[in-house]
């Protein structure tokens, strides 16, 4: 078996491709179930954000598993496989492990060191467990990646002062307008990204902010976090009226369909000189045809790269420090992974010794007769079990801890031969991975 990741990111695909492959949380159960139905995929975890979509798998046969996974991605996105392949990356075992560690630490993000990705990795792990996608291997991998992400943020300064997608969008708006306090702002959406938009807009001097959301209650919950700010709250029913009065529009919702297009915006902007729209959603909330309107200047997440680049250079040295920590985490995971090949031998040895213990205990108790107290039987049961555990403990620990692959395999072969165990198939199977 092998660990693999197949996916795309802001580095390999533009937003119009990424949005077609987006797998939001509300459809992950369906996607996970479909992937688990393929014969060569044992475990599955789907990480889907505005800047990446990656599927982590444990495959019985690597080539067959990759083929099944890429075919699924083509069908899901409705992009022909030949066209999709140019945007996909495929990483196997140690490379896949290191990739998830880097993602979790924020080293593969558009915004180097950003903190949101760690929460997204945690959510991926949680849902992969909930929907029976992750098994023992991906569970261990994601736990270690989450731990690595926390460690990098604790032991380095990579997360200090890091810009986010939201702050980069606000920075771009300030560059384009110079004075945010003189402009009326509308934010469509009331989730985490919108909360960050409000935070950064207020810090840059914006003071005329309206929040539009399907649920007014959710908008109120967002406003409660900014008690001193005069935020205007509206439902989407008021969208046309609010946008008519807005100079800057930010969109950040989980909608899979565009909320704004040319037909909606044309009557809104017909009597003004310009309107700027900053769409930080994937899939995009703003249709590309709005650019046909001369008054509209629309920006999406891919347009933020220039802003982010200004923040990156000072963080590269911190990233190098983080990489060395991640190498330790990868090595730790690899030791655990390699120890898995000892499981069939250890399991067979324990089963055989336990069977002998039970047989000999039964003989001894039958000789002692029925008058032998039950309490005494429990004592003898515990005694024999303790002896077995003590005898097996050191050999099992030493076998698992042996990092020299050939030495470990020779030890397993010796145990199989000496105790006449039936774990040879398991050893052979691990040798082929």
From Swiss-Prot:
Annotated metabolic or biological route of this protein: Porphyrin-containing compound metabolism; protoporphyrin-IX biosynthesis; 5-aminolevulinate from L-glutamyl-tRNA(Glu): step 1/2; Porphyrin-containing compound metabolism; chlorophyll biosynthesis
Positions with a binding annotation for substrate: 49-52, 109, 114-116, 120
Active-site residue numbers: 50 (nucleophile)
CDD domains: NAD_bind_Glutamyl_tRNA_reduct
EC number: 1.2.1.70
TM region(s), chain numbering: none
GO molecular function terms noted in the UniProt entry: glutamyl-tRNA reductase activity; NADP binding
Catalytically driven reaction(s): (S)-4-amino-5-oxopentanoate + tRNA(Glu) + NADP(+) = L-glutamyl-tRNA(Glu) + NADPH + H(+)
Principal EC category: oxidoreductase
UniProt keywords, alphabetically: Chlorophyll biosynthesis, NADP, Oxidoreductase, Porphyrin biosynthesis
A GO biological-process term: protoporphyrinogen IX biosynthetic process
Site (Important for activity): 99
Protein origin, superkingdom: Bacteria
Residue sites binding NADP(+) per the record: 189-194
PANTHER family: GLUTAMYL-TRNA REDUCTASE 1, CHLOROPLASTIC
Family: Belongs to the glutamyl-tRNA reductase family.
Note: During catalysis, the active site Cys acts as a nucleophile attacking the alpha-carbonyl group of tRNA-bound glutamate with the formation of a thioester intermediate between enzyme and glutamate, and the concomitant release of tRNA(Glu). The thioester intermediate is finally reduced by direct hydride transfer from NADPH, to form the product GSA.
UniProt remark on domains: Possesses an unusual extended V-shaped dimeric structure with each monomer consisting of three distinct domains arranged along a curved 'spinal' alpha-helix. The N-terminal catalytic domain specifically recognizes the glutamate moiety of the substrate. The second domain is the NADPH-binding domain, and the third C-terminal domain is responsible for dimerization.
The protein's assembly and partners: Homodimer.
Purpose: Catalyzes the NADPH-dependent reduction of glutamyl-tRNA(Glu) to glutamate 1-semialdehyde (GSA).
Name this protein carries in UniProt: Glutamyl-tRNA reductase
Organism: Acaryochloris marina (strain MBIC 11017)
Taxonomic lineage of the native organism: Bacteria, Bacillati, Cyanobacteriota, Cyanophyceae, Acaryochloridales
Name of the gene this protein is made from: hemA
